[in-house]
Amino acid sequence: MDYQAILDRILDTVDRDAYLTPSTQVDPDQRAALEQVGRALQSPDLEPGAARALVERLYEEGRIDRVMRLSALHVVAAHPAVADYALAARLAGEQELAALELGGPNLQANLASADRHRGVIAFLRGHTAIALDYFARALERERTAENLGNVLCALLRLGEVDDAASLLHQIREAYPPRVVAELAARIDQDPDLALLRDQEIDA
């Protein structure tokens, strides 16, 4: 794995058309439904079966599409309380195929989601360089605060603190205030990004 080549891809992506960065392309109705799943996963009394049942109910009610169903089921499978990484990997593959079959204007965002899920599995399994590659792919497809945060997490886990700090500075200079603010909130909340908290971020 050529770290410098991956880093160059990331820096090029951050430089390129930063102010054209879209907001998340999940439509508001689906986003609201997925937030229900997120709240269920944050519960201290998490029951994986109940979380999966919630995902299936939202799908049956037409509140999420097939791609988002597979994405949400992946998130449940990869949750630390479940840690079914074989299932999570299979669901990421199924999500990619579903995204290709669906096509449409959200294709790149849906493929970015599958790349992001693969990166999460690699990250949780200790293959951080591979995770960085997946996160870089996701960022190339969809330049969002979530994908930027994942790249920064992987850089820090690899011990590349200076590169992470430099990238953060570049993001602050190039990206819209909305994205910078979203990333700042994530840095404040995510323990994997704690080393960047002394890097001032102006929204």
Stretch-by-stretch model annotation:
Residues 72-141, 146, 150-153, 157, ...:
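Alpha-helical adaptor scaffolds
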Residues 120, 124-126, 157-167, 191-203:
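Alpha-helical linker/edge segments of TPR/alpha-solenoid repeat scaffolds
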Residues 11, 15, 19, 23, ...:
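Amphipathic alpha-helical repeat scaffolds
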Residues 52, 68, 89, 132, ...:
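Conserved positions within tetratricopeptide repeat
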Residues 106-115, 150-159, 179-199:
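TPR/TPR-like alpha-solenoid helical repeat scaffolds
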Residues 16-25, 45-46, 64, 82:
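Charged, low-complexity interaction regions
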Residues 40-43, 58-67, 97-108, 177-180:
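Flexible helix-coil transition and linker loops at the boundaries of alpha-helical arrays
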